Amino acid sequence: MLYPEQNEARLKLSLDGTWAFALGSCVEDQFDPAKPLPDAQPIAVPASYNDQNDQTTALRRHYGWAWYQRKVTLSTFCAGQRVVLRFGSVTHTANVWLNGKLIAQHKGGFTPFEADVTALLHPGETALLTVACDNRVNHSTLPVGNEDGQLAFFGSDNAGIPSVEAAKRAAAPQNRPNFDFFNYAGIHRPVVLYTTPKEYIEDVTVVPAVDGTVQYAVKTTGSAPVRVTVLDADGNAVASAEGAEGAITIPEVHLWEPRPGTPYLYTLHITCGADVYDQSFGVRSIEVRGTQVLLNGKPLYFKGFCKHEDFTAHGRGFDPVLNVKDVNLIHWANANAVRTSHYPYAEEFYDLCDREGILVMDETPAVGIGGGAAVNPYKEYPLAEHHRQVLAEMIQRDKNHPCVVLWSLGNEPDLEHFPQDAYDYWHPLYELAHQLDPQDRPVTLVCCQNDYTKDITTRTMDIVCINRYYGWYNLSGDMDAACYGLNQELDFWAEQHKPVMMSEYGADTVAGLHTAGAEMFSEEFQVEFYRRLDAEFDKRPWFVGEFVWNFADYDTVQGPMRVDGNKKGLFTRDRRPKLGMHFLRQRWAEIPTFGFKE
């Protein structure tokens, strides 16, 4: 599925703005999609609906379907064209109707979907567009939610007390996310109508090599001849070819590299009959060789942030202003990488990372697969088919981005209690990712802090990615013990002869809280936490990177472990740096992107 663009052959019409909105229930067909919503209120699109009306807690605590509606008029300029309705994402399950006719259904809240509406939406006519989205998470969704009778992530309970058990039985149904971020929902990313000619370019795949050879494949719906031209960054034609697939050689090729290098971008300009499409790409290689990760043949060190799509008022909604600000803060911090924890981000963010030279670890929404020794998720959770779907959709969407250098299959599953079942679940996904990616990028799985000696899955990934909280959740506040424990584990990973990196580590830090002795939750402790652990990373030549948790404070489910959200951000939620960020900024300024451990 190509990203919609406007050019001489295609028209793109935004449907973003203020829509009509109504909360539903758990009944999927509660409202008639062919009629105006009853008692509708205004809602902004794209954005989460949860925090847009503080006059009531109903939106914040909603459980079930929510309904959106607006009128759509197609311009007469679109006459004779194919017309497509596209959603960047709707969280988590979506049904879409046009004039009461069901035109699309999609499960998965972080990837795009679309419907051909040429036969239903005619130029000069107005139609009623209705969208219903279901925010419920359970054992069949990604991310995973807990079922009735179970706790939310970091929830608390005095199980067995009669009054507590009675209150639980009497309580209204609610989401119990098995993940540590707020379950925002709604139409989160842009909604557009776009047109193409009747015969059109359907898909483009670009596989560049550092010698300047570019393999390409163009999928079309008709028989018109295909012509491709490579344009340099100034728009000059440097190579061309005929045919729907083949190879082009770029003379004196410029490579794409992360900042402070040059993230040089080319454009593959494609014509097919009346249709035209431009696909940007960068020429770079990424591979694992021994215990090193090589980008363009040079040993790479990741200096990165884990992030969330999260901000006040619009929740997880697409925000181009915030994306630009965050990218500039990443540059300011002297970082070079982002992990899209814990789901694929908006497509426009990857475009920015391509342009600005920021490396991306691209992650599926597979978080929360595990519940301790009592539950075997690989036998009891019906997830495998949906997991394959979201993995395939992510790779298909992001395959041409030079910024994407690593696929993450998921976050912190249970790999300890049912090790063989875990391997049997995850290894086929690892193989599938390699099969689906035409550039064959490295593939990983981010593992949590459990008994790593029983984990037989992580060690089989291309890069070992470990989430560890020595000094915070384990050996809390004792950084001497934390460093000892970390080194005990790193000795184990050294024996696996793989590149290893810390994909998540951090300490909750209340902005403005200061202590003389670097006590937990203070800004001083955040500095000490990173200073001590980072020094241990630097001693290991096979340790290839660090992704701090988190870029900024973010919202979570209520619970006794969270006071107004997760405070592990190096920036506050409104993007003010804490002391720990100033420490990391200096550290990362002294670490080169290439050749740090040679």
Language-model features: locations:
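Substrate-binding clefts and catalytic carboxylate motifs of secreted carbohydrate-active enzymes
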Residues: N7-F31, A171-A172, F179-G186, L193, ...
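Short hydrophobic/aromatic-enriched beta-strand-loop microsegments
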Residues: H106, G357-T364, D462-R468
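The substrate-binding groove and active-site-proximal loops of carbohydrate-active enzymes
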Residues: G109, R176, D180, H308-V321, ...
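Catalytic metal-binding/acid-base residues of hydrolase active sites
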Residues: D134-R136, Y343, P365, G410-D414, ...
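Short low-complexity, flexible loop/linker segments enriched in glycine and/or proline
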Residues: G145-N146, L352-E356, V375-E380, A384-H387, ...
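Proline-centered loop/turn at the N-terminus of a beta-strand
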Residues: G357-L359, P365, D440-P442, P499
